[in-house]
A protein has these predicted regions:
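Conserved lysine of the Walker
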Residues: 45-46
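Interdomain hinge/linker elements that couple catalytic modules in large macromolecular machines
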Residues: 1-9, 149-219
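A short, basic N-terminal segment
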Residues: 1-28
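Structural recognition of the conserved hydrophobic beta-strand(s) that form the central parallel beta-sheet
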Residues: 92, 115-121, 142, 151
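Short regulatory helix/loop adjacent to the ATP-binding pocket of P-loop NTPases
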Residues: 124-140, 154-156
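Hydrophobic anchor at the beta1->P-loop junction of P-loop NTPases
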Residues: 37
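Short glycine-rich substrate-engagement loop in P-loop NTPases that contacts/grips substrate
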Residues: 59-90
């Protein structure tokens, strides 16, 4: 957990853009309900959560961590969180679907009064599976790849006021966006876009869609 705090602080130091969401961040944080951030793989759910909490005192648990999962003990984990993050106001549970029976544990934390932000992309996080345990306790926040305005913003161009000298660049970005989409990683590394998208496509179809619908033959 201490190493995860160091990773959290490193991620918070990197440059990002503010994402567009249905609800303003300050309104979300004021709500005592569970903030559930879902969406496809690699669209920036964790980054959005970190940015939303950047100016607050928050604790962080990343369940995309085999060591944490292999040695998981709820009581020890919570005590360690309180030791590492003194008097934290929010608790961010990243990729929490990797924890067996995560929904029951999250509900328990909610009942204890923790203000929770959780992220997940696996098929197990989809609304149908959550309906029984979390009903009435969470606010859904759907994340998607960058929109075209967000893509333009990444290049330090205000999409609402494009200078004449930047218009050719924006047209080029629009063409690339139509061909490649708006996944954050390919915006940063266009040269590797096709290979990255191919791998991502396989992951989403073979791991998420096939698993959710119990498709055995994916040929």
């Amino acid at each position: 957990i201490l190493h995860q705090r160091e990773e959290r602080d490193r991620l918070l130091s990197l440059p990002y853009i503010n994402r567009q969401t249905t609800y303003p961040v300050d309104v979300l944080l004021q709500s005592p309900m569970i903030k559930l951030i879902t969406g496809p793989r690699r669209v920036g759910k964790s980054v959005f959560a970190l940015l939303a909490l950047k100016n607050t005192n928050f604790a962080y648990l990343n369940f995309d961590d085999n060591q944490l999962l292999a040695n998981w003990n709820e009581d020890i984990a919570m005590q360690t969180l309180h030791d590492v993050y003194l008097d934290f106001q929010y608790l961010l549970l990243d990729e929490v679907q990797n924890l067996p029976n995560w929904d029951l544990w999250v509900t328990t934390l909610y009942r204890r009064g923790y203000n929770l932000i959780i992220t997940g992309s696996n098929a197990r996080m989809l609304s149908q599976e959550m309906a029984t345990v979390l009903t009435g306790r969470y606010i859904p926040i759907a994340m998607y790849p960058f929109s075209l305005p967000e893509t333009v913003q990444w290049y330090d161009i205000d999409p609402t006021n494009i200078p004449t000298e930047k218009q050719a660049k924006v047209v080029s970005l629009q063409d690339e966006y139509l061909r490649l989409g708006g996944y954050p990683e390919i915006i940063k590394t266009r040269a590797l876009a096709q290979s990255y998208l191919s791998t991502l496509y396989d992951s989403i179809l073979l791991k998420d869609v096939a698993k959710r619908h119990k498709i055995r033959n994916t040929d």
